[in-house]
């Protein structure tokens, strides 16, 4: 659903020469100024619209960002320093990548909460959704999931860590093991799923295979 709060209403964006390139619209504004409107989507449905205005004091000077509606935690100034002085097109395109990837990560988290909220315990994420952690507690083990994205343009994690912690009340755990400090087991299949599938798809895969993985884990512990 479109968030109209980020749609520019200033008259400077009305009745101007525009160019549409994929999911962005470029406006020719007064003077040496350019307005860019970024349209974001998830699963084919429109999400937020953001805008950014670039200006140059003269045609000989480099452009700078004079206003924008991007989330404050996205590093627009760093992107400006890195790209805008040398390549305005690269700056515009890279900002589009950052915005769309942020929306993808955010909406993936929203979707697993919507679909599987009754199975998810604690859930934490950083503001740009580059760190996501949650627990699954509706099983014989407490499963902790931690995923990280090393770059703001990634929609699949660069790192994934999934650990199964035996619950002391689990039927298969012996009395001696209940008294001992629980030792977690890594769920490699779950880590692989998180790195190759979208978060909702990976979650479904993890839950589907979890009983078999836990059975193997308990069998391995009992045979040691």
Task: Explain the meaning of each model-derived region.
Residues 5-224:
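Charged, low-complexity assembly regions of eukaryotic complex subunits
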